[in-house]
Amino acid sequence: MKLAIIYGEVSTKHQLIMERAEEIFDSVLAVPIDGLKFLHGEEEQKVLYKDIDLTEYDAVYIRTDDRDMMFAEHLVEALNEEGVVTQASNDTYSYESNKFYSMKVLAENGINVPDSVYTLSPDVAVSAAKELGYPVIMKTVKGVGGEGVMRASSESELKPVMDTMKSFQQEICLQEFKEHGGTDTRVIVIGDEVMAYSRSSDDDWRSNISGGGERVEAQLTEKMKETARRAAGVTGFDICGCDVIESEGEPFILEINGSFGISKEMNQIIGQDVVLRIVERMHERALQKKRNS
């Protein structure tokens, strides 16, 4: 069985995945996403890295960032059409590449998300913020790990940021701020399996790790588990991380990330080898597909 791991930037995360994958798969190939090209003919299509055709692989695990989302959309579609196992459906990266779009899709499927507004106009944003009520969360529609996420407590804080975002041609997404006690939970969905850790910060309302949050053991409710599973299913992810908060007694999804952070520290807190479970899941699906073909 052959697995390719596609990555946007070299990091210890990909090295950890490679180590675990080599324990399970017969052959493992690391592929930089900027080294790929598509070849479309009348009767065939190929996804090439040098002279290697990834459509001949059993499984491909894709980890990318927001800069490569459009490329990832075409990539996962080409691989899925050729029968290669991936962790995403054809439409998944169109959802992940736009935070407002993903929230819209989740809401349309009955999943709790903060009320959101999407606009190109700073003036419209100011008016919308009054309707949402301060404080409001300001987001660029792209970005992961807390990038491009700010909070405004008043119009005087909001307007300059909106003007700056407009000058840099950034699309604007506003969200209502949900009180959650400074803690959110990263729920990792791998098939039907759910595992999690919480992230807490006393000094920053953004509790994500890159924003200064600390990983702590999570207390998952059944509602949170089911909400994360449904969110993954709606957006087409077989493997993903869902950022979940509890507010007003209900779980709310803040974001879905296919390239969520992984580390040995995370494994220790959760009490499971998450990376190994990711690789095992890819292997299980590839093996089942081969048996059925």
Named regions from a protein language model:
Residues 168, 206-253, 274-292:
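A long amphipathic alpha-helix within ATP-dependent nucleotide-binding catalytic cores
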Residues 1-8, 14-19, 54-55, 79-83, ...:
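Active-site nucleotide/adenylate-binding loops and adjacent lid/helix of ATP-dependent enzymes
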